[in-house]
Amino acid sequence: MTWRSAWFGTVALALLVALSSAAAAEEEKIRLGEFIPESAPQPAPETGFTDADGKPASFADFKGKPVVVNLWATWCQPCLKEMPSLDRLQSQLADKLAVAAVSEDRAGPDRVGPFVAAMGLRKLKIYLDPKSDVGHAFNVRGLPTSIVIDAQGRVVGRVEGAAEWDSETIMAVLKPFLESSSGAIKDAAR
């Protein structure tokens, strides 16, 4: 093999790697804000966090009702953009769905409480996770990330990046979990 053949092979390989990386980045970009279903739903982690008053909470508290767990922070601009739509979602579906906005801010309630009040969020229930235990348990790569847990307590999918949570697209994604939860809630009441 001559040096020209080796050089050509190296350039071709480098070009192939660059194109593959660009295609993967484009695919990832397209998926931001879209629902990514779990191939095999698993039970939600038993990781604890607290409510805004500092009382312990866990995902078991929501069993029997689907929950959207939104991981966010006050410094995250895309998080702030989607918060009003999460508040509207909770308002529209309060009897069928729980929305848990889990702040990953390290400053805790001193920073989060006034911030939420200033945003005018009225229905959205705020939780705190200053050590990011919830984010680690769900292998979160960035904020915002929202995890959808069904009424049986299984992680069924996620949305990485901001989403318009009260849009027709997201409502269509949530609909099967809302419909299946009504049976689970009835069974739990027996």
Residue ranges and their predicted role:
Residues 65-67, 71-75, 142:
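Short pre-active-site segment immediately N-terminal to redox-active cysteine/selenocysteine motifs
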Residues 116-123, 129-176:
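Thiol/disulfide oxidoreductase modules built on the thioredoxin-like
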Residues 9-20:
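Bacterial N-terminal signal peptides
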Residues 80-119, 130-136:
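Structural microenvironment flanking redox-active thiols in thiol-disulfide oxidoreductases
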Residues 37-41, 46-67:
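A short beta-strand-turn-helix
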Residues 1-11:
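Bacterial N-terminal signal peptides that target proteins for export
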Residues 181-190:
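Non-globular targeting/processing and membrane-anchoring segments
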Residues 21-46:
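N-proximal helix/coil linker or "cap" segments that precede and/or mark the start of modular domains
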